């Protein structure tokens, strides 16, 4: 029986095992999918070594906080993973680890399903980790007009700007400045656990007076404090979660097998 994992920390609240259990049952696939808690980089390395040696583990999803850290442990990447240095899916093939970024595809489906046109839009992105890099690349490729990054980590923020600023001359990318008036902006939250800690609420206070067009929270597990903000529309990450999983399924089984699944039914049952 084929085995698949999702690894990260914390991992107990992940809905991925329930999602894939339903998928495998629906498609009559004999496979198991389970969550594995990885507490540190040393454990991550051990897990990857186990994957290389195992005859049963076919692939795994990678979640916070290891989407970037895993990149040094695998053998090759897809193009999006190379650009973003963010990997959320691996496939084991002949003892080699292949890395993929399916979050990009998931976000692309999210904006399509919710009829969002990012061309010429102004956007504030919260966070500067692997997920933020993925979303920012998507904004750039969709010809967004402005991207302002709001993050506590100035080093990773500066690196994003350095890496991406030359990709599209139509897109301006910069550090958020609370002395500037932001009007007609979207807000995209790419932080891992929402804005619940005191340090993260300090970030929220910097945008409290902005009237947002659309708020997109790519999380699907956490209830954030965005209801206290002003916005016309809010979208959470269930669509992105499901479609990145569909992409993982297609990669692992080397086919468009996800086309057989009823997305709306899955969203109703799992999310």
Language model feature labels by segment:
Residues 2-114, 222, 229:
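Phosphate/diphosphate ligand-binding glycine-rich loop within oxidoreductases
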Residues 8, 101, 111-112, 116, ...:
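Glycine-rich adenosine-cofactor-binding loop
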Residues 10, 152-154, 219-221:
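Residues in the short beta-alpha loop(s) of Rossmann-like NAD(P)-binding domains
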Residues 65, 189-193, 219-220:
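Short glycine-/small-residue-rich Rossmann-like dinucleotide-binding loops
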Residues 75, 195-215:
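Rossmann-fold NAD(P) dinucleotide-binding segment
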Residues 144-164:
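NAD(P)-binding Rossmann-fold cofactor-contacting core
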Residues 168-185, 206-207:
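Short acidic low-complexity segments
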Residues 211-259, 263-265:
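Rossmann-fold NAD(P)-binding glycine/threonine-rich loop
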